[in-house]
């Protein structure tokens, strides 16, 4: 790992950038991809799934290296790198955001990648915090309870209100007392 920027653009298991896997420079043209990953003269136009005619893939193909697990892994990395870097959209995302961008592209699409990196950018987080503080959104409950409609009554007034509501207290002894008067009890039936 020579630089942090290279570390951000890793996708292969061997911790090499996809350009290094294909032995290409970052600004390589599509013709360079064809040269690096070209077909043999025997099959000028093989089907899409056909990988045996490609120079780089032939070196590490599992059929050419039987029993070599490392060659099979390198072959898989070469095919994955070619699939990503030959697609212009995936290549652009890989150049901008690295392997995380490719992972997000595979799961959420191109729009998902854009929104993810916008929402995780430092300037967006700063903007959200600034707007929240300026509009008192995060202090909504505090503002409503302190000075808004849900403001509790002051201590002095609340004591008087409770004293006015209590007219008499029930007896404290264990004696049972009928709180209804006799006049009301006869009228109720």
Curated annotation (Swiss-Prot):
| Record's bilayer topology term | Lipid-anchor
Q: Which residues cross the membrane?
A: none
Keywords (A to Z) from UniProt:
Chaperone, Lipoprotein, Membrane, Palmitate
| Subcellular compartments | Membrane
Task: Tell whether Cytoplasm is among the UniProt keywords.
Answer: no
Post-translational modification as stated in the protein's UniProt record: Palmitoylated.
Q: What is this protein called?
A: DnaJ homolog subfamily C member 5G
What is the organism of origin for this protein? Homo sapiens (Human)
- What gene is this protein a product of? DNAJC5G
């Amino acid at each position: 790992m020579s630089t942090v920027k290279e570390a951000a653009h890793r996708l292969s298991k061997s911790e090499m950038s996809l350009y290094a896997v294909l032995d290409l420079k970052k600004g390589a043209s599509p013709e360079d991809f064809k040269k690096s990953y070209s077909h043999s003269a025997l099959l000028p136009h093989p089907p899409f799934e056909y990988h045996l005619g490609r120079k780089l893939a032939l070196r590490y193909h599992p059929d050419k290296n039987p029993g070599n697990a490392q060659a099979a892994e390198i072959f898989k990395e070469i095919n994955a790198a070619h699939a990503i870097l030959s697609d212009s959209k995936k290549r652009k995302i890989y150049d901008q955001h690295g392997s995380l961008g490719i992972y997000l592209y595979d799961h959420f699409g191109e729009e998902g990648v854009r929104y993810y990196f916008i929402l995780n950018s430092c300037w967006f987080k700063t903007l959200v915090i600034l707007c929240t503080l300026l509009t008192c959104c995060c202090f909504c409950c505090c503002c409503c309870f302190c000075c808004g409609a849900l403001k509790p009554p002051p201590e002095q007034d609340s004591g008087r209100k409770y004293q006015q509501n209590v007219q008499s207290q029930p007896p404290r002894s264990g004696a049972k007392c009928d709180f209804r008067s006799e006049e009301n009890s006869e009228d109720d039936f």
